[in-house]
Amino acid sequence: KMKNLPGGLVIIPLVIAVVLATFVPQVFQIGGYVTALFYEGNACMMGFFLIVCGSMIDIKQVGMPLYKGVIMTGTKFLLGVIVGLIVGKICGPQGFLGIAPFVLIAAITNSNGSLYISLSSQFGNATDTGAISILSLNDGPFFTLIALGATGLANIPIKSLIAVLVPLLIGFFWGNLDKGFRDACKTAQPIVTFFMTISIGAKTDVKTILTAGASGIVLGLISAATA
């Protein structure tokens, strides 16, 4: 089972998609539903994923889960902003080892909710798992866009922030008004993550990964260390 491997829900479909994109890329270009879902479906799946994340935010969740969620979310956000600003100040727009400051911010401020739930359920307690109600805000690009705009490293149009916020709010209000919807989203999250990861891997191949070189390895390690 994919759950037996930490992060397997992301790693396994990603590896499969990258291998297919490298050796038989035409499988994603059949057209129709296949191309729409497995190759062009990333934006749609991300919108769905944001609704799911929003539904996980429980306004009744107080105490230790709220405390842990706020601390982890705030720490990741501040760490990403500080690292991005320092690298930008010292190395300039070109960044460190070819890694631009805004890329570092995106890698550090974001998180993987599915991986967190998997690990916290296995090794943590109920309060650790409950913290996802706040940490899920970090799964999408919302905080990343705010960080990039706040640091001045990117000019983020207000429409982009609204486009991210709307599905989050839809999920938030619907999930708090209807517990059944939240439960359905909780079940759907791994499925959405699975297909979203495939569409990401379908646009990548082994040659791209290899040409990333040292900068790609460093970025991957930084992202993994701060996940």
Q: Where do the model's predicted regions map?
A:
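Loop-centered beta-sheet repeat module
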Residues: 128-175
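Hydrophobic transmembrane alpha-helices of secondary-active transporters
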Residues: 14-26, 35-68, 167-179, 187-212
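Cytoplasmic-side transmembrane-helix entry/capping segments in multi-pass membrane proteins
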Residues: 5-12, 64-78, 127-136, 162, ...
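The feature identifies polytopic integral membrane transport proteins across all domains of life
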Residues: 32-36, 65-74, 93-108, 125-134, ...
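Transmembrane alpha-helix boundary signature
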Residues: 23-31, 56-64, 81-102
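Short helical (or helix-break) motifs at transmembrane helix termini and adjacent helical loops
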Residues: 109-122, 128, 227
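Entry/N-cap segments of selected transmembrane alpha helices
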Residues: 36-39, 57-88, 140, 204-227
